[in-house]
Amino acid sequence: MKGGKAMTISEVSRKYGLTADTIRYYERIGLIPAVHRNSSGNRDFTDEDCGWVEFIKCMRNAGLSIEALIDYVAMFQKGDSTIQARKNLLIEQRELLAEKIKNMTETLARLDVKIDRYDEKFVIKEQGLSGKNK
């Protein structure tokens, strides 16, 4: 392994906060290229394998679908002839993510207004109660 010793699936799982089952699933569907296995049949994750795990986790956290990631990995494996197509896929996914962020920001602002209204009503109610005790 370049740059260090190979990692077990448990170590990769802990490092990236993914279950071992999730990592196996990602490998099975081709999101992570086939991981080398040692003489005992256990996976030995290289730095490159870990790079794929980290990339997939980041993209999933950003909301990319499994299908979009499968397309991306398939294009990547075809080589440089797919560079523009990969870039286009990432641009498209970025636009979808930007729209989600915009929608979530708007929702957050609405929630803040709603919470402020509750705070205002609570303060008015407290003021009314304190006025009754005088």
Question: Where would I find each of the regions flagged by the language model?
Answer:
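Short, charged, low-complexity amphipathic alpha-helix
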Residues: L69-D80
